[in-house]
C-alpha cells in the first residue's frame, strides 16, 4: 500500500512553501476530538506532519500562542486500539493530548525555523438555534461541553453579550444539532433545550459610521 500511495506534497505557509524533505519540523492541526476515553474526558489533537521528523517528547513552538509545547504520549489509532508513537515522518497523522491550547488549523514548528500555515476554511452556517441547559444547576458542564464541541467544529457559537446560560449556535445542517444534543447528554450529562431561530445567514458587515 505504501508503495502505491502518493508521496507527501509541499504545503504553502505564509512565509514560504514547506517541503516535506525539509529537516525542520512542522505540523498542521487537522482535527480535535474530546472524550475519546469517556472515563478520563481526554482531548486529543490530531496533526499531520508536514516536514522534519517527529520524536516522542519533543518540544515545539505553537505559532498561534507563541508558546513552547512538549508533545508527550503521541498516539496512533486503529478503531479502539491506541499505539504509542516513538517517531513520525511527513504524511503521518498522530494524536497528542492537549489541555485546550490548540485549535483546528494551528501550526506547530521548530523554534529555529518558524512557519505558519493558513487557516482552515469554515463553512458558513445555514441553520441557527438558541440552546440552553434544562437544569440550570449544570451550567458549568454546559459551558464546558459547548466550548469543547465548538473547538472540534461540531457547531459554531455566536455569543450574546451578557448571556451566560444560553448560546446562539449555527450549523451547516440540522443533523449537527442532533449530534450536539446527543453528545452533551452522553458525555457531559446535560439535557438541552433547543429553540430554532428564523435566521439563514451570519455575516460580518464592514463599513464606516
Each PLM stretch: what is its role?
Residues 1-209:
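Structural and coupling elements of P-loop NTPases
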Amino acid at each position: 500500500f505504501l508503495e502505491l500511495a502518493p508521496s507527501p506534497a509541499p504545503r504553502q505557509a505564509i512565509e514560504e512553501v514547506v517541503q516535506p524533505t525539509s529537516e525542520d519540523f512542522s505540523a498542521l492541526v487537522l482535527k480535535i476530538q474530546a472524550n475519546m476515553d469517556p472515563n478520563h474526558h481526554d482531548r486529543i489533537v490530531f496533526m499531520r506532519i508536514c516536514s522534519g521528523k517527529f520524536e516522542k517528547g519533543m518540544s515545539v513552538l505553537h505559532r498561534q500562542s507563541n508558546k513552547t509545547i512538549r508533545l508527550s504520549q503521541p498516539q496512533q489509532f486503529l478503531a479502539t486500539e491506541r499505539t504509542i508513537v516513538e517517531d513520525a515522518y511527513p504524511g503521518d497523522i498522530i494524536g497528542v493530548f492537549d489541555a485546550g491550547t490548540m485549535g483546528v488549523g494551528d501550526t506547530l514548528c521548530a523554534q529555529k525555523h518558524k512557519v505558519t500555515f493558513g487557516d482552515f476554511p469554515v463553512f458558513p452556517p445555514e441553520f441557527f438555534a438558541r440552546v440552553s441547559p434544562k437544569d440550570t444547576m449544570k451550567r458549568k458542564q454546559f459551558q464546558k461541553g459547548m466550548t469543547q464541541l465548538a473547538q472540534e467544529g461540531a457547531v459554531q457559537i455566536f455569543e450574546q453579550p451578557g448571556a451566560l446560560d444560553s448560546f446562539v449556535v449555527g450549523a451547516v445542517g440540522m443533523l449537527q444539532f442532533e449530534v450536539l444534543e446527543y453528545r452533551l447528554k452522553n458525555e457531559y450529562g446535560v439535557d438541552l433545550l433547543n429553540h430554532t431561530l428564523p435566521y439563514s445567514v451570519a455575516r460580518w458587515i464592514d463599513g464606516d459610521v
